[in-house]
UniProtKB/Swiss-Prot annotation:
It catalyses: tRNA(Val) + L-valine + ATP = L-valyl-tRNA(Val) + AMP + diphosphate. The gene is valS. Its EC number is 6.1.1.9. Keywords: Aminoacyl-tRNA synthetase, ATP-binding, Coiled coil, Cytoplasm, Ligase, Nucleotide-binding, Protein biosynthesis. It is an enzyme of class 6 (ligase). This is Valine--tRNA ligase. Signal peptide: none annotated. It comes from Burkholderia pseudomallei (strain K96243). It comes from the Bacteria. ATP binds at residue 545. GO terms for biological process: valyl-tRNA aminoacylation. Monomer. Belongs to the class-I aminoacyl-tRNA synthetase family. ValS type 1 subfamily.
């Protein structure tokens, strides 16, 4: 073999395009179901089927894939289940927009044809995101990939719905929901974005019914007064206590409504009197229930005023009605004042339209109703059980503080609205008779049988609504494993080991998976929830299209030109006026576009930033640093191969050194340097194992980086060169063996984080290191399924670690002396040394090579060294004195030092004057003052050194 077997430079795309498909083809991700091995499994949070990969996905999947590869290499039965979500609203909107561009609405097509179009779109674009997941190096078991609307998943959804209905835990009722008047559907809280906006606070006079005066009512939404059923004051508000129980006339409507008292009122807000509109406000709805006030709806589903309002406003859009109502109140002298007011406005995240609380007929899951007999937890509600399993420690959150958030959400829970007025999704399995009869069944045939059993023989019409996307997502922990059937996968992989997720969906997804899984299987869905932060830009800003700061992970992997990047960031903006600003910012930030960093560099960056619970401020400069790391690892491997291929690397004898085999005169003569790097590797292996156990990927990445770059490459390779050049055959053999074995171990250690480069290098290193599976030709085996390194405490060698620390200190001291004396790297000079003669003699060949010296001369004592030093700088390291012997022009050196000392003294005077100025210290930012103090300390330190050098110069 020659060194040409490894390409001269690291080309990530070549390796990724080879090994990604190869791993998948070989089926390494399909688990053995070996009862003697531990099980490890993870669910991939299913991304939207027609979506594209974003930085949050890349981060999340780096963590998951790292865990999966680690446990697979530990020999566990390892399953990572991939899948995609049908994403009801998101997908329907995309297809509706395509139709809009053709001048066609979904209603023109009809439901059946429209759903066909969505399926066509899913088939065309659905592989985009799974292709991108593959590009990030993710290694789930693709043979088990699911789509939340495929036949098996749909069967599970219907089964759950029917069983919950039969158990009395699903019901249909009229409740207040978030309503999007453009999409004409209920939406979940997660699809509502509330941001502070500038609005107004109107003070309106409501005349007392007996004509004795009026109450001034404060509101931010005057149009909803048409649906007022009461006005409300705080029961302890002395200003209004005497009016409770009386009535006011509702302006413009001329009906009388009561004055009620409720603790909900904030006495400090406005006038302390507020209107009660149960049909169009969530808080008012609860007030209405407490006081038995019937709600009055005044809006149509598309947010126009309906026939319950006075004729003058019927048919008006809600905001046009607001203006007309305010104008009429003003004309009647009932508008007391209008004041600017900041308020939180809820908008649909898909449409940007103001969301309207709306009373509609919907399907709900009962959150607090006790489950009946025959279930896993009779007498307890699904919420109660979900709280209990976390309190008992069956599920733990990492970091632990998210447990509190989970409790708070569940302790204040409302019944879950699960119906959506869409066409794309799981159609609700309910059929209606002509007189309002409801038959919930697994299919229409069962529904007809139910109807017949109850004596109904008329027509049946299926419910048009579909289920909330989160309903099917909540079943994934068991539906993806084959439920309702009992499968081997259910036995091995439920509960899964860990869920890796962002904090934003703890309630919407995490809590609901706990509810559904405990209710239908009696088990928790996962043992641990690892909650990570969100990926933000380098300044800590949220990444968003409107800010123009989004990054596509695939662009970081493959690179993208500036013009293409600008086009990507400026097309499809909600507000096209932002395009110019975004273009300017992008051209400034990426003048040459984004270079190709490769998947491994991106993954290493993500892992290095994965501190517990904190948001990740993604910085491309870090990515460049980890690409440089990959290059360093590649070049180190080339060096090792060049120095080991074709040589005796010490693998002709058994692994374990027998008596006399490993030492002077033995088959292998390991040096202290060899033993040091092996000892240090045990510590790194232990640190990495702890990092995986604690989900501290930042610690894992840092341990790998520091060991490879700082210890193996910067120190051990340089020491190994000396040993190969100067050593005996036994020493050379031991060094080559150590070079290979440590490198091969490093490749296995780093594989879960940087899978592609480690696989490519392992193919070359493992055969030489005696670690390639027997009987396999190069390329036939894979690093992906090799054993993960485990620390061996017996290989720790503190004496050799101390030896290395002392050697490094001597080398560093020599390098510092070179710097002090302004020696160019090409200039080789002798080192004079005195002190521990035996140690200095042992260090000599290493120090000579690493500090670029012509020789190392060990003198008998310090007196001899001082006599030979001729005033040159002396370094003291432990009990050793070191000096570089450089012939210098004493007069010229004295002049140079004197000039530099004078300059430094001048700088010190300036610094002292600045720091002695009270105004500067008081007004300057602390960082500026600290910087000045640091400069002063550096000047003083250098002055002391130069003074000592000057004093040592001969007269």
């Amino acid at each position: 073999m020659s060194d040409t077997t490894l390409a001269k430079s690291f080309e990530p795309q070549t390796i990724e395009s080879q090994w990604g498909p190869e791993w998948e083809k070989r089926g390494y991700a399909t688990p053995a179901l070996d009862p003697s091995r531990p099980d490890f499994s993870i669910q991939l949070p299913p991304p939207n089927v027609t979506g594209t990969l974003h930085m949050g996905h890349a981060f999340n999947q780096t963590i998951m894939d790292g865990l999966v590869r680690y446990h697979r290499m530990l020999g566990h039965n390892t399953l990572w289940v991939p899948g995609t979500d049908h994403a009801g609203i998101a997908t329907q909107i995309v297809v509706e927009r395509q139709l809009d561009a053709q001048g066609v609405s979904r209603h023109d097509l009809g439901r059946e044809k429209f759903v066909e179009r969505v399926w066509e779109w899913k088939e065309r674009s659905g592989s985009t995101i799974t292709g991108q997941v593959r590009r990030i190096g993710a290694s789930p078991d693709w043979s088990r990939e699911y789509f939340t609307m495929n036949d098996k998943m749909s069967e599970a959804v219907r089964e759950v719905f029917v069983r919950l209905y039969e158990q009395g835990l699903i019901y249909r009722g009229k409740r207040l929901v978030n309503w999007d008047p453009v999409l004409l559907t209920a939406v979940s809280d997660l699809e509502v974005v509330s941001e502070e906006e500038n609005g107004h606070l109107w003070h309106i006079r409501y005349p007392l019914a007996d004509g004795s005066g009026h109450l001034s009512v404060a509101t931010t939404r005057p149009e909803t007064m048409l649906g007022d059923v009461a006005v409300m004051v705080h029961p302890e508000d002395e200003r209004y206590r005497h009016l409770v129980g009386r009535h006011v006339k509702l302006p413009l409507c001329e009906r009388e409504i009561p004055i009620i008292a409720d603790d909900y009122v904030d006495r400090e807000f406005g006038t302390g009197v507020v209107k009660v509109t149960p049909a169009h406000d969530f808080n008012d709805y609860q007030v209405g229930l407490r006081h038995a006030l019937a709600p009055i709806e005044i809006l149509t589903l598309d947010a126009k005023i309906n026939d319950n309002a006075p004729a003058a406003y019927r048919g008006l859009d809600r905001f046009d009605a607001r203006k007309a109502i305010v104008d009429e109140l003003d004309a009647q002298g009932l508008l007391e004042s209008v004041k600017p007011h900041k308020l939180m406005v809820p908008r649909g995240d898909r449409t940007g339209v103001v969301i309207e609380p709306m009373l509609t007929d919907q399907w709900f899951v009962a959150m607090t109703k006790p489950a009946p007999q025959g279930t896993f937890h009779p007498g307890k509600s699904i919420t109660e059980v979900s709280l209990e399993v976390v309190r008992r420690g069956e599920i733990k959150f990492v970091p632990e503080n998210w447990t509190t958030t989970y409790y708070q959400w569940l302790e204040n829970i409302q019944d879950w609205c699960i119906s959506r007025q869409l066409w794309w999704g799981h159609q609700i399995p309910a059929w209606y008779g002509e007189n309002g009869e409801i038959f919930v069944a697994r299919n229409e045939e069962d529904a007809r049988a139910q109807a017949a059993a109850k004596g109904y023989t008329g027509a049946l019409k299926r419910d048009d609504d579909v289920l909330d996307t989160w309903f099917s997502s909540a079943l994934v922990p068991f539906s993806s494993l084959g439920w309702p059937n009992e499968t081997p996968e259910m036995k091995h992989f439920l509960p899964s080991s860990v869920l890796v997720t962002g904090f934003d969906i703890i309630f919407f997804w995490v809590a609901r998976m706990v509810m559904m899984t405990t209710h239908f299987t009696g088990k928790v869905p996962f043992g641990t929830v690892y909650v990570h932060g969100l990926v933000r830009d380098a300044e800590g800003q949220k990444m968003s299209k409107s800010k123009g700061n989004t990054l596509d992970p695939i662009d970081i992997v493959d690179g993208i030109g500036l013009d293409a990047l600008v086009a990507k960031r400026t097309t499809g903006l909600m507000n096209p006026k932002q395009a110019a600003t975004i273009e300017k910012k992008t051209r400034k930030e990426f003048p040459d576009g984004i270079p190709a960093f490769g998947t491994d560099a991106l993954r290493f960056t993500m892992a290095s930033m994965a501190t517990l619970g904190r948001n990740v401020n993604f910085d491309l400069a870090r990515c460049e640093g980890y690409r440089n790391f990959c290059n360093k690892l590649w070049n180190a491997t080339r060096f090792v191969l060049m120095n080991c291929e074709g040589h005796d690397c010490g693998f002709d004898k058994p692994e374990v050194c027998g008596a006399g085999d490993c030492g002077p005169g033995g088959y292998l003569d390991f040096s202290p340097a060899d033993r040091w790097i092996v000892s240090l590797m045990q510590r790194v292996e232990a640190d990495i194992a702890k990092g995986f156990a604690d989900y501290r990927f930042d610690n894992i990445a840092n341990a790998i980086y520091k060991f490879v770059w700082d210890e193996y490459c910067d120190w051990y390779l340089e020491l190994a060169k000396v040993q190969i050049q100067n050593g005996t055959p036994e020493q050379q053999r031991a060094t080559r063996r150590t070079l290979l074995r440590v490198l091969e171990t490093v490749l296995r250690l780093a594989h879960p984080i940087i899978p592609f480069i480690t696989e490519a290098l392992w193919q070359k290193v493992a055969p030489l290191a005696g670690r390639y599976p027997a009987g396999k030709a190069e390329g036939e085996a894979s690093l992906m399924v090799q054993a993960y390194p485990v620390a061996e405490p017996k290989k720790l060698d503190e004496a050799c670690e101390q030896w290395a620390a002392e050697l490094k200190a001597v080398v560093d001291a020599c390098r510092n002396l070179r710097g002090e004396m302004n020696l160019s790297p090409a200039t080789k000079v002798p080192l004079l040394a005195a002190g521990d003669a035996a140690q200095l003699q042992a260090f000599a060949p290493y120090v000579q090579a690493l500090a670029r010296l012509s020789e190392v001369r060990v003198l008998p004592d310090e007196a001899a060294l001082d006599a030979d030093a001729h005033g040159a700088p002396i370094a003291i390291v432990g009990g050793n004195k070191l000096v570089l012997k450089v012939e210098i022009d004493v007069a010229a050196e004295r002049e140079r030092l004197s000039k530099e000392i004078a300059r430094l003294e001048g700088e010190i005077v300036k610094c002292n004057a600045k720091l002695g100025n009270e105004a500067f210290v008081a007004k300057a930012p602390p960082a500026v003052v600290a910087q000045e103090q640091k400069r002063l300390a550096e000047f003083q330190s250098t002055l002391t050194k130069l003074g000592a050098q000057l004093a040592r110069l001969p007269a």
